[in-house]
Amino acid sequence: MLHACNYQWWDSRWPEVKDLPARKTTIFEDTARKYGIEYVPGQWFSGLSDSPLISYGHSAGYQLLNLAYHKEPARIVLLGYDMRFAADYDGKARKVGSQPRHFFGEYPPELQHWPSVKVRDGVHVELVDLYRSVAKQGLVEIINCTPGSAIDCFPSCDIESLS
């Protein structure tokens, strides 16, 4: 599955990803029509939805968690969900800080976005709180296999130790 929650990503990356043999999804109807990909409706709320809707939750990763849940898995494994920004990150000043916000590096300038996020001591606390709401629901087993993750509401382990 390939999911992006901002239309700019699809506009920028479409030539590179259009032929990938993957389910491609977005939360924007216009973008879905433009590229012939699947539109996924959503709303702003905490936790997972068992209806066709997903929770927007400020990130594609959070949205993917809800999309995975719709497939009724026995277990979901998180990889790359650290929720950490550089300690010197300053979203209001549009300053990334001393390290990128994503495992793959920082977006190029045309794709950088500065959502309303609460970052405290380098931790994306707003998203961590949303994951806590998912944990409280207890709808599916979720294991966080992201080394050094700020998400502490799910059991964690090394990916190699999973069976």
Where do the protein language model's features map onto the residues?
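Metal-ion/cofactor- or nucleotide/acyl-coenzyme-handling active-site neighborhoods
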Residues: 1-163
